[in-house]
Amino acid sequence: MTEVFIYDHVRTPRGRGKKDGALHEVPSVRLAAKTLEAIRDRNGLDTTTVDDIIMGCVDPVMDAGAVIPKAAAFEAGYSTRAPGMQISRFCASGLDAVNFGAGKIAQGADDIVIAGGVESMSRVGLGMSGGAWFMDPSVNFPAYFMPQGVSADLIATKYGFSRTDLDAYAVESQKRAGHAWAQGWFDKSVVPVKDQNGLTILDKDEHMRPGTDMQALASLNPSFQMPGEMGGFEAVGIQAHPEIERINYVHHAGNSSGIVDGAGVVLLGSKAGGESMGLKPRARIKAFANIGSDPALMLTGPVDVTEKLLTRTGMRLADIDLFELNEAFAAVVLRYMQAFDIDHDRINVNGGAIAMGHPLGATGAMILGTVLDELERRDLNTALVTLCIGAGMGTATVIERV
């Protein structure tokens, strides 16, 4: 098998996913093109040598449809020889794009792949692509399918996390993200988004509220009590998990991930591919895995896939220096830390999606890049990146510095 190296990564800032968000007027294809331009220019890429561009997008409809990476490559001025492929595994799409690219390189099919993702949630709303999970009772009834927020509250109830636990985690996420930005730790990987006149539209994650405290969060009402109780989904959850008498509704806007716009890509290659363009590898893809998990709990896949990946590789938790897990909801991370007895100082050390937002198809690539930068900054070696996924799945990737 051919070794797969990470040569570079970039991302846009995350803009608030609303009509008054800074990136609302920037279509998905342009967000993706900004990252393709940056990864090319930073590394002096000859784009005729790019074997594939793979990007995740969870809702590829309207102006986010029709194979965004190929359109973005045209927008960015790439050679017409560079192909593109759009994928979706819900929230893990960006990381799975990286894993798909790594697999192609490992098999010797490709030498240079750009992989990542994009989502403009202010322009294409969550769930706009529809699908059987949401609309077909022959699928969602037997699967005990529920809105993700109700599943997150089910996790909190089942594993004993209080609202105070979740809010304390959210406050820390905000503090860590604010501190990392203030220290300039994101500067080398974040590419400002500019308009056609070269004026900066956004150069910093827009969703953050680093001054958030417990008192402010205490004023927020639970977000998922109405669909749980009035929509009948609490009964679905209890049917799936009869050990639970009632769901405690503890998630709200302040301890759940932010809806945002953004894009990110990772430059992957074989040793020969990198050497042909004078690139220096920063890390290697050591292993990756996917798994299905309980569809009612839905968001516990990171625990299951981490166990699978460690078993497959013979690695131990002690071999991992840092962990990155998408903060879809605070209970997701708390359950992961509980399951593996991981100290908070090893996971999401620069904050996460509660603070900075979760641009669905892009997040996996973004957090892989974030943890690589942090490994380098701390002079550490190995990281595990994992994401929970709608419908009950998990994806994980292990990287190590070279």
Residue ranges of each PLM-predicted region?
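N-terminal extracellular/periplasmic Venus flytrap/periplasmic-binding protein-like
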Residues: 10-13, 24-34, 42-44, 168-271, ...
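Glycine-rich loop/linker segments at domain edges
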Residues: 9-12, 16-19, 102-159, 226-229, ...
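Short, well-ordered amphipathic alpha-helical segments that serve as non-catalytic structural scaffolds
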Residues: 28-44, 68-72, 97, 149-155, ...
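Glycine- and Gly-Pro-enriched alpha-helical subdomains that act as flexible
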Residues: 271-319, 337
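Conserved catalytic cysteine-centered active-site region
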Residues: 27, 57-111, 131, 143-150, ...
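Conserved beta-ketoacyl condensing-enzyme motif
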Residues: 22-113, 117-134, 138, 190-204, ...
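Active-site-proximal alpha-helical scaffold in enzymes
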Residues: 87-118, 156-186, 265-272, 359-380, ...
